[in-house]
């Protein structure tokens, strides 16, 4: 994308319907946590997939693989022999603003866990400010750490041997954070997420999506429940998500009933 001229532009959200980027050039494309930023001369397009969004790339004129009514952003870029078209479907967030507003747009986010030189100390500090909170909720909160989603949360907790409902103050939460960073860094350039080291279909995760399947370590059936947590950096309003864990490898916190399926 970088260096290509915009030859067509359509923002299909009311607030930005009159924005035109034709004639500008793409200067830079970069992620911050779960957010994607694209700079076109002196303006930035900011998007977030949330739960349903996706980006598709086509040649201009080709049939889209997803329905037209789901498109929120359409950008045509100069290319030979045919221009290419980027289509953002079902995007949960779309913004356009000037360069000076970039830092304000990420002000509520914690350090990006996938930056080469990320601010681990700041992430640790933010998590430690709420010691009574569950580690599962703390990891998912983008105000603590930007970038961790539900799959990596579940897998990091399993690999670290920590129940997702365990309180921050009762565990080595820095170790869990380091595990999350390590498995995410290992997957950052891969089209397939793998935490087990095995790329075969159905064998890529330890607990995520494996309810009632045997634990890959001890054979105990993986359990599934719900864990509350506010994702301040993008998934506003989604206060709980499904979580998976092994009741043997990740024992429930003492005095809780959170080792039972369906706990909330």
Regions found by a protein language model. Name each.
Residues 1-264:
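Structured catalytic/nucleic-acid-binding cores of DNA maintenance enzymes
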